[in-house]
Swiss-Prot record:
Residue stretches spanning the membrane: 32-54
Subcellular localization: Membrane
Domain of life: Bacteria
Keyword Transmembrane listed: yes
Membrane topology: Single-pass membrane protein
Main location: membrane
Protein name: Uncharacterized protein y4kG
Keywords attached to this entry: Membrane, Plasmid, Transmembrane, Transmembrane helix
A GO CC term attached to the entry: membrane
Amino acid sequence: MFLLQFAQRVKDLSMVYEWDECNARRGYILKMLGAIDVAVAVASVPTLFVVTAISHDLMSALATPQVDR
């Protein structure tokens, strides 16, 4: 009887360990996805400024009349 109870407790502990390991893995994956989201957001802000500046320069160049001399 003691061996059966001991075996059941070992099985329960291993299931808890597997559950904790699964949650830790899930947490790590979520952290990595969050870091990727932040990296994309940080990288896109300067790109947005550059594209805006280029389009502003192009629009002002097209808006000014060209005088032939």
